[in-house]
Each structure stands twice: as C-alpha cells, then as structure tokens.
C-alpha cells in the first residue's frame, strides 16, 4: 500500500532526558524517524526536552520544540501546530506514556489527531499487566502464573499460594523501576510497597519466578498489510532474573536448536500480529533449557534499547523503516538502504557474532547496590563484532573502559574461593570477570553451570580463552600461537603480559610477520547480495573488504559507552564534527563502540569502524586508512587519553597539540602557564602521599578541594574541612603516587560559571558565558546553568572574556576549549581548563545558533574565524533566558546518596527557555520531573553553617502559603528568630519522623544540607532516600531551592486584607 496522502503534518515525541533505562538509543531512533518522514515529504514537528541530542537540531525536523514533555506543554504545542497525526513509538516509555495521557485527557479527540505506529489498545494490551495476560491466554501463549495486585496484602496472599521466589513488576514503569525478585515475605512487602508507589496506576504484577531459564529476545517488524518478519534474535548470557539491559547479550542467539528457534519465532510473530503493531516491536521470552517449555515474559510495543542493538548488529535500520510503515508503506515497497537493491521484506542473515556488554556507573558510586536483578542499573553499553564468541566477547571487554583489556580483573586473584563463588552465584555488574576467574582456578564449566544457570556453551568458550592464555604462556614469541590468540580476540597487551614483554614489541612482531586484521562489512545478507554500506569490523582472517579511497580522510574518535560524566553530549559533538569534515571535502571516518548512538549509524559518516577505542585497535585502522590526521577533542576523556600514545607512534593529531593538552591537565605546567599569563587561580599544591597532602592543606588553610589529576566528571573529588577527613580521603579514595599526584586546592565559596570557547590560534570566539545556580562545590555537570548570566557584572563578564582569550592563545588551543571560573568579591579565578569539547556544547550550540563543533572542526582543518564570518570575543547574547538542568537516576540506584557535591551524579539534562528567568526555571523544573505544587508543606533539615540562609527561604515559603516543618535543631533556630516551624523527628520516631510523613504524602518538598563532617550523616541519607523513593522533590543545595522558590513566587497570589 503506498504512503498515505490524507496526512501532511506529523508530530514526533522524543524521550526526554537520559536516565538509566532510557538512553541515547532514542536519540538515534528519533533522528532516523524524523529524517525518514521528511524524506517522504511530510512536515515534521518534534517535541523533546533534551538539548544534548542530534534530533533536536533544526535540520532534523521542520519545527523543533525543546520544551518539557508534560501534558501542559505538549497540549499547548498540539493546539498551536494542529498536526494530523502523532508518532509516539520512538520516544521510549516517555513517548508512550505521553500518548496515553493525551488520549485519556481527550486532547487527541478534541484536535482529531491520529496515533500512528501502535494503536492505544496495543499499548494498553502490552503495558497493562491484566490485559496482557488476557491476550496471551487468547493466543494460547504460556506466561508465568501471576496476579495483579493493588495492595501489599494482596501480594502476600498470592505469593502464599504459588510459593517463593516471586518477581514483582510495577505497571507502566521503565527499565524495571521499582520491581525486583523476592525470596521471602519480608522482601515482598518492601518491594511491593515501593513498586505500587512508583507505578502511575498503583498496580503491580506478582508472578512466579522463572529465574534460571534462558532469556531470548526477538526483534520483529510488521506493516499494515500484515507482512511480518524477524530482524534478529538475541540471547542473554545471563539467565532470566537479570534485566536484559544489564545482561551480556549475543546476537544471533547461540544455543537454541532449529526447532526452538522456529517455536519462539512463531510465538513472536503471532504476538505482533495480534497486537496489530505497525512498526517495530520487541518480544522477550524465557526458554526452559531442559525441555521445550517456554514463557512469554514481556512485549515492548515500540522501538527500544534492543532495537538499537538489533539495528547496529544487523545493519537493518529498524527506526527508519518503522517510521515509513507508520505512514502506510509496506515492507515489500521499501528498499533496504543497506544493500540498495533488496527490499526490506528480507530477514537479515549474519555471518558474524555480536556481543553487547552493559556499562555500569559503580566506578562513580562506590556505595551503590551492585547486585543485579529485574531493575536496570547500567547507564550505557558497548557492542563488538567478531567471527567467533571469544573474539566478540574480548573486544567488548576492552571497549568498556573500566581499566581491563581482557576478561579478567587482576585484583580478583587475591579473592578467597568462598568469596569468589558467592560473587559467581549472586550476580553483580562484574560477574563475567568472577566466572572467568573461577575457570582459571579449575572449576569446571559443569560446576559453574549448575551454580549460575549460565549455558555450558558459553562457559566452554571462557575455558577456551583460558586454554589459549596457557598456550601463550608456554610458548613465548611463537607465531602460530600468536595467530590463534588473535583469531580469538586477544589484545596485544594481554599477549605482552603473558610473554613478559611490551605491547609495542608484540605489535612489531605482528607487523613484521603480516599478522594484521582484515575489515569485514556488515551487510545484512551474509554477503549474498552486493552491499554498499561503509560499515566495518575487524577480524583476523583473509580478504579485507574495506578499500581505502583516493580521497584524503580524517579519522574522528568517538566517546565510547555512555556513563556518568561522559554522556550523549560528546556523541553530539562527534556527529557535528563529521558533518564539517565532509563539508570541507574530506572523507570522514568514525570509530566508536557504542550501539545506542547516532554516530554509529552508518549513514552518518563516509566510513564507520565499530571497534574498541584502544591504542591497538585505533592504530590498526590508521595503518589501513592512512588518514591526514585524527581528531580527538570531541570524544571526551576517552579520545583525549589516546592522543599521547598516538602522537608518540607518529600519528598526526589535528587541533590542540599533545604538549598543550598536557599543559592544561598537568598541575605544575598549568600553574606555570597561568603565572605567565597573569591569571589568578585558587592557591593549591600537589601531593604524592598522605603527609604531603596534610602539609599542603595546613599551608593553604581549610576547607580544601582534593582530587586526582586527569579525570572526567569529578571522579573521587571531595571538599574536606579538617585534617582527619583529609587523611581518611588520602587513605581510601585515591591511590596517590608520584605518577598520579593528588591536587589540593583552596576551596573558594563563590559564584561558579563556565565558558566554551573556539579558537583558530589567533582569534577566540566565545559563544556565551553560563552562570551556575548552585555555588562552587557542586560539580558543573550537576549544576543548573543559566545563559545569558543573570547576576554577573559587566566588569566580571569582561574579565572572563579577557582571561578566556589569554588562555586560548597562551595554551595554543586550536578548536574547542572549556574553562570553569569561580567569582568571589568581583574577583575572577580560574578553576580548570579542558582543551576539548565539553558537555555544554550541545546546549550552548542550541541557544546561540552557533554550530560550535562544526566551527571548531573547520578551524582544526585550517580555516579561520574571520573566514567563517565570526568576530573575535564574546558573541552578542540572546534576549531569551535558557536553563540547562540536570536529571538524575537515583530511583534506579539503591544505596547511592543523592547529596550533590564535587563528584558528578546526573545521567542526563533538560533545557527550559522563556522570556524571563522564572518562566525558564519553571520549564526546566517541569522537564526534569521536579514538580512542586503551589501549596503544601516543606521540611527543613539544615546544617549549622547554613541555618541563617535557610531561615530566609523558610520565611519566603511561608509568605506564599506553605507550611514549614523542621527537624529539632533547625526548628529551634527558626523559633529563636521568630519563625514557628512544626518540629519533626529525623529518623526512628515511628510515626513522627520525616520518612513516615513522606510515606503519608504530608510533605511536598525536602530541603536538606549537610555540614562539614560528612561522615555522621546516616540519618540524612535515609531522609534523602525516602524522598527519592516517593518522588518528593529534594533540594540538597539552598541555591536550587531558592530557584524553585522564585518560580513559586512568580506563580503565587498575594492574599491581603483591605
């Protein structure tokens, strides 16, 4: 059926900020879909609150609204734009929930807007646990025995009839939020109570646990003519019981017989047909390893994390085709863009193995609960492609960037057998490494399979890796063993370690004997048809399919997996850099390992290498492609860390040179540079051990800010107020050494702001200054940033511009740089300089209309700012106010403290823009799901040093009609200054403490600050946790609370007697 002509204008809903469970895969899907609809001639309107995405660029849709994805704002845009149809299936759970809400509130009927892709009834059937159960029974598809409950007591009663363990799944939540596995009644009560609160319909499904079954996923497509096909099946390494987003996954599935595959394939196709989904859909099934029994676990009636993985694993562009199907085209009418000759009705065939490993945030959250279960915890993932399981698994391990280059963590050798086996059985994020260690200790695959229910097939592969390690150890410099190791994905570094030599020597030996990788094409059809995709992976074999072109090329390094501190913002910069390289007439080559992102979409660059970002893997591509040079400044710390080894190997680094990158990163060189440029910085010193640190701090005076050099996202950074805390930090938080000194700086409590600048070596363009709402001490990635600045004097702004120019020229910056300043008493100090693109590039690019990464790339390739039409200095500021606000994923991470400090904790961001500061703030808070009603109670629990300031906030809250509650000390302080607050207990006062008030819904906001001694704050942590679990707005910085107050004051009415 040809495409529909009765609709002209389509609105697409994006997925909003990045949180755990909903990451960059939706930027990829949304970008694909918008371009796909425009290609068919429709007018596209996009709504998304996340500025750090490619999809919110002006050229992706005809009209782009960066506004909160809430009923209030989406309705406004619908009424203004009057689209004919709405496509919600590309915005993740956010998009689906928004569509449901618009429908329930009658907005879609009122404006006669049609839903495309998935009908509401299908969303309901797939998402509502009761309707799903009915549908499966009608289709005679088996599902685990289960019961829908609305109260904790109902849950306990049902569990008693089927027996433990049981699984709790809240309805309409994302990434398993609030769910979990319960082994007994105590756990069941706890998890159900929390799950009911987090479910928007206060409903949970309690089901029999089928933990230990194989977890298999099918990614299916269907069109309006009822053509349906399987794009790809995937098998989890971890059995059922661990969220698929936290599991290691292989595609295609490896351990099923043909009969089992056909059985599950038929089930998946019958489900998508019954739901009448037009587009993509993901079906998760559990297969009993010992019989042909299977259960349907769940269905996602939308494009998901797994579809991004399936798209990248097969090359089959699911989101692009889902958008075309949504407007009436059928699979037998659309050409598969990969081959350019076959139709999309072909099921992809793979002649390789893909491995996906999740990336977890526990390097940032040392206290976080690492046990894996049905609630997702990973922030991102890596994917690797190889010709066998060993190769793809080991390539994925070294893509993770957790300091490993093989499936082993050396420290585990010291773990006792008992502790090892406990970790093997009770899965945490690093289970793969524990299982590998167990095999190295001689546990057999059979024994481990019995303990873990991991298929013996995979454990045999881990055993094979260990056997090759032993071969290598026994035969140093043996070329045959070297070839075997390379065929199985071993890195030069691992081989060097086993041979007692250096990586360089192994590389030399390989090159001399022509043991080099070949690059194979990902073509969706196992080389059956000719293909034109420039999408490659490396393997050791024969016939290289990646042919170097005659055009001069530039290699751009991506930023790897998404993690806290290095998010989708860097992918945004990478994609823009590629556009500029192409515009300058070069061939653009991308190298990256993240399957969720736009940069790994093969249609973005001229060539895509899906490879780990390590020195060895990058050099292999450089040896083949011989590019003009490599651009490292857009790939975050990942790419910057590769600059030095690459330069040593004779590779041309384009943009700021390695020596100058060093001057910004190395403390002593940086101080030297600032002295020469006559720019003040807070007094500080470096220390290589505990005594030196204590001495430095005495000299500078407390409080001090301590941190390791060379890190991103403020890892292991702390503000310490006394020597005792400092010594404990030096002992536990860092491994200080002469090679890795610790920086000790005077901590200045002032106004913080930051600048992104672009330099061509002579002139410096400063697109804008962003002022932070939270004062210094909260990581810049967790602060709310305002552009243009609201409180900085003209003089301070001029000083900032002057220092920025001096630094850019003095440090020989070519391209992008980011500088952070702190201002106290009108004096400007430089805190740090990053000679690369930073996480504020997308936000600032959007609000100033300067495509910063593109401009920077053109300068790197030799153009000047004046040639591009930009003037030197600070760019004229916008008349509107724009705010970038952080978004956190604390609900997903048990035991992680939500207190903000110098170590970054946010996973994503939103933007609010309007004519005034208050309106922009309102939008930013709404978009980041911090909604405060206009009346209610606010509770204060405040450290001594901030009580004075909190008193003023409390008075203002009272003036707009809020009730004030406070803990004992705070209430006494308020009372002594004439403000009566209702006292509440901290913790343990049964019905009168803060958590119980929170549970009863009597508190609308919590303002909690922490004093200088952070250790004694367990009560505070429990209070903060209760706020997170019940969705009560929590402010741990008074500046954020003050910003929220401004919003409330601007919306409140004055009530006065005449």
Curated annotation (Swiss-Prot):
Where along this sequence does the record place binding of ATP 2? 707, 746, 748, 752, 777-780, 820, 832
Q: Does the keyword Amino-acid biosynthesis apply?
A: yes
Which GO molecular function entries does the Swiss-Prot or TrEMBL record give? ATP binding; carbamoyl-phosphate synthase (ammonia) activity; carbamoyl-phosphate synthase (glutamine-hydrolyzing) activity; metal ion binding
Q: Where does Mg(2+) 1 bind?
A: 284, 298
Q: Name one GO biological process term.
A: 'de novo' UMP biosynthetic process
Describe the reaction catalysed, as an equation.
hydrogencarbonate + L-glutamine + 2 ATP + H2O = carbamoyl phosphate + L-glutamate + 2 ADP + phosphate + 2 H(+)
Which InterPro entries does the UniProt record give?
ATP-grasp, ATP_grasp_subdomain_1, CarbamoylP_synth_lsu, CarbamoylP_synth_lsu_oligo, CarbamoylP_synth_lsu_oligo_sf, CbamoylP_synth_lsu-like_ATP-bd, CbamoylP_synth_lsu_CPSase_dom, MGS-like_dom
Which annotated residues bind Mn(2+) 3? 820, 832
Q: How is the cofactor bound?
A: Binds 4 Mg(2+) or Mn(2+) ions per subunit.
Gene3D superfamilies per UniProt = 3.40.50.20, ATP-grasp fold, A domain (3.30.1490.20), ATP-grasp fold, B domain (3.30.470.20), Carbamoyl-phosphate synthetase, large subunit oligomerisation domain (1.10.1030.10), Methylglyoxal synthase-like domain (3.40.50.1380)
Q: Identify the residues that bind Mn(2+) 4.
A: 832, 834
Q: Where is this region: Allosteric domain?
A: 930-1058
**One GO cellular component from the entry?**
cytoplasm
Q: Where does Mn(2+) 2 bind?
A: 298, 300
Q: Which family does it belong to?
A: Belongs to the CarB family.
Record text on subunit structure and interactions: Composed of two chains; the small (or glutamine) chain promotes the hydrolysis of glutamine to ammonia, which is used by the large (or ammonia) chain to synthesize carbamoyl phosphate. Tetramer of heterodimers (alpha,beta)4.
The identity of this protein, by name, is: Carbamoyl phosphate synthase large chain
Provide the organism lineage as a comma list: Bacteria, Bacillati, Bacillota, Bacilli, Lactobacillales
Q: Which gene encodes it?
A: carB
